């Protein structure tokens, strides 16, 4: 029956007035069966697995990230949009798998989560494939060439990079830009210099920044979520400082001014966590002993929020830590990021129980995809490993140099430099970009040496953009696109070195 359907399409396209639609018939035939033609250009695969099935393996590797995108977006939308402060408190105090499962089954429900998540993600996926497919077909008809299989991967990668609240027409515009400008104008699949999915996201990021950052990470209706958070904060009696919000780790990091120093964060952490020892405790205790003279009977780990703010924002001459009062909120928020408190715990960051772009939240899901891609030989483990090493070492060097240059354990260095290096690997889209974007075989280098340099460069640039550039909360997208630009040059020098060794 399927064969008769395919043959009928071929018969229609063989007629004179429908011959221009031959690429459509060829694409349907190739999708259902093996290719009927031999490739005339790369990639050449001498195997029973053709390019289409090779692309499908990448799609399979994306299954964990896709499922968790649906699951997590459903959970976050139901919790943040509930208007129930008690439900939010229960969610934020989840401390393990047992308590997480208890919360899911008793307070929300699996079906509600999946239904809500599907309503958020599936429309974006359908738009991505539909609009991208139309663009591919139009170019194939006009140029009279085959419809390539590249959209199989681009069509699912692209929606996974988007915030859940993105308007549908913007999502359509982004995938059209990615397919047309970054791929088809360069000659089609296999000829593009930049990653099409990331190019589409970058286009939206710079064209509609208000829809790609800020309060856009939960549910499908930002207004409803804002009203829900206001209701929850009002019910729970929360202030602006300790209230519920939908800020992400990287938003918190990016909004923290250099005026917020490590000593400010350590002082807040020693109070919140009642930690007897923090890296800058000598500076804190020295200042607190002066401040306490005018505030007798107070202990650092027993201060109320108002007293803590008073101590941290008092002038240095009065025994305080000299933070501007307007910066205390930022210092309080970044303390959660640096010390892994509440929703920013390392467990939440690793498993994906946080808000963010649809596919970037779960490092665990990305690792599952990485293992599959490496085992099947599709993605380069060298690029992945060097990317991770570059990011880790760069984050660690920021911390070490801050301590060495400033002294006193970096007490007066910007707090943003002291996020633990390993936590940088869990933040934002680093895991997703490392596994699925940086390893794109078309826009990344092909030589082994070039892959190592390419990964190290992207990892370095990711952390530099995150910690130094105040305009962009996330550095992965820009770092990978910049790496794509330099990939041919890296291959060129790698080949030159290889030839010299042979000579």
Swiss-Prot record:
GO terms for cellular component: plasma membrane. Its main location: membrane. One of its GO terms (molecular function) is FMN binding. It catalyses: a ubiquinone + n Na(+)(in) + NADH + H(+) = a ubiquinol + n Na(+)(out) + NAD(+). It is an enzyme of class 7 (translocase). Disulfide bonds: none annotated. The keyword Cell inner membrane applies. Its cofactor is FMN. PANTHER family: ELECTRON TRANSPORT COMPLEX PROTEIN RNFD (PTHR30578), NA(+)-TRANSLOCATING NADH-QUINONE REDUCTASE SUBUNIT B (PTHR30578:SF1). This is Na(+)-translocating NADH-quinone reductase subunit B. The lineage of its organism: Bacteria, Pseudomonadati, Chlamydiota, Chlamydiia, Chlamydiales. The gene is nqrB.
């Amino acid at each position: 029956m399927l064969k008769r359907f395919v043959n009928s399409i071929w018969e229609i396209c063989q007629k004179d007035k429908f011959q221009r639609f031959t690429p459509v018939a060829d694409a349907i035939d190739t999708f259902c069966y093996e290719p009927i033609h031999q490739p005339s250009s790369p990639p050449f695969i001498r195997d029973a697995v053709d390019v289409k099935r090779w692309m499908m393996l990448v799609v399979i590797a994306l299954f964990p990230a896709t499922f968790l995108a649906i699951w997590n977006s459903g959970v976050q939308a139901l919790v943040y949009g509930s208007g129930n402060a008690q439900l939010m408190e229960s969610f934020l105090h989840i401390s393990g798998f047992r308590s997480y499962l208890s919360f899911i089954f008793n307070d929300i429900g699996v079906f509600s989560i999946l239904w809500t998540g599907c309503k958020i993600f599936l429309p974006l996926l359908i738009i991505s494939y539909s609009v991208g497919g139309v663009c591919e077909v139009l170019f194939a008809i006009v140029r009279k060439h085959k419809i390539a299989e590249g959209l199989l991967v681009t069509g699912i990668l692209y929606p996974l990079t988007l915030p859940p609240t993105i308007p549908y027409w913007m999502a359509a515009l982004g995938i059209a830009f990615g397919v047309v400008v970054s791929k088809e104008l360069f000659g089609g699949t296999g000829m593009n210099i930049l990653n099409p999915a990331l190019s589409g996201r970058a286009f939206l990021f710079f064209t509609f920044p208000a829809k790609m950052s800020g309060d856009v990470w939960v549910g499908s209706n930002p207004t409803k979520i804002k009203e829900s958070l206001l209701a929850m904060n009002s019910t729970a009696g929360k202030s602006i400082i300790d209230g519920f919000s939908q800020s992400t780790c990287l938003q918190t990091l990016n909004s923290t001014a250099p005026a917020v120093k490590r000593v400010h964060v350590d002082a807040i952490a020693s109070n919140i966590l009642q930690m007897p020892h923090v890296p800058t405790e000598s500076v804190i205790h020295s200042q607190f002993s002066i401040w306490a003279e005018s505030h007798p009977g107070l202990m650092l780990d027993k201060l109320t929020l108002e007293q803590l703010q008073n101590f941290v924002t008092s002038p240095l001459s009065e025994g305080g830590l000299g933070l501007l009062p307007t910066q205390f909120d930022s210092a309080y928020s970044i303390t959660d990021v640096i010390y892994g408190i509440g929703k920013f715990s390392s467990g939440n960051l690793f498993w994906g129980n946080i808000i963010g772009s649809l596919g970037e939240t779960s490092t665990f899901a990305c690792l599952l995809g990485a293992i599959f891609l490496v085992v099947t030989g599709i993605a380069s483990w060298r690029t992945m490993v060097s990317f991770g090493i570059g990011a880790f070492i760069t984050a660690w060097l920021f911390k070490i140099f801050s301590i060495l240059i400033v002294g006193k354990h970096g007490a007066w260095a910007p707090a943003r430099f002291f996020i633990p290096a390993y936590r940088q690997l869990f933040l934002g889209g680093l895991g997703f970009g490392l596994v699925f974007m940086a390893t794109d075989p078309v826009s990344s280098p092909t030589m082994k040496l070039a892959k190592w340099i390419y990964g190290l460069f992207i990892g370095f640039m990711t952390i530099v953009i995150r910690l130094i550039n105040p305009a962009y909360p996330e550095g992965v997208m820009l770092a990978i696109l910049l790496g794509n630009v330099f990939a041919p040059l890296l291959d060129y020098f790698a080949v030159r070195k290889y030839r010299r060794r042979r000579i």
